[in-house]
Structure formats: C-alpha cells, structure tokens
Amino acid sequence: MNQQRYAAYRSLVTELNEWKFARALQPETHEELCDAAEGLLLARGGDEAEEPLARASTTVLGMLALDELDEQNASWLLDAMLSCGPRMPQALEHAA
C-alpha cells in the first residue's frame, strides 16, 4: 500500500457511501464493492489483487446487466477500483 492507493481507496469509499445513501446502490452491493476495494488496497502484488478485482468486475457487470449502472459510471468504478490496487498491466490490457 502507498499514499496514492490509500487516497484512491478513500475517494472510492466516499463515493460508494454517497451512492448508498442516495439509494443508488443496494447495501449488499455496497459491501461487496467496499470489500473488493479494501482487498485491492491491501494487495502487495498482482496475484493478490486478482481475486478482489474479479469480484468487483463481476459485481459491476451484474449491475450493468440489470441496468442499475450506466456504462460511464461502470467504467469510472472499475478505474477507481484499479487505482486502489497495485499496478496490474495485464488487467489494463484486457480492459481495453
């Protein structure tokens, strides 16, 4: 973890809390995304970050499928998640 990743994590959690309080995010989904963000924050390398990133991606894709999230916010959310974790060049290649 470093200061930049911690700041990204705090910013993401603040935004997720706002979405939850605005009822734009279900409590279970909020918990899943916050847990994944914390897992990414605490990951020391790409291998440790794969599982929380996969959970976050699955959650975001599910929200897109149910029209609970638009593509712009989904893209922002995944970018914000990636910012919480260690550099993962292979994740960026697959996301493009």
Task: Locate predicted features.
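Intrinsically disordered, low-complexity linker/tail regions enriched in Pro/Ser/Thr
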Residues: 1-21, 96
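Amphipathic alpha-helical interaction modules
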Residues: 16-62
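Amphipathic alpha-helical binding modules
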Residues: 9, 57-96
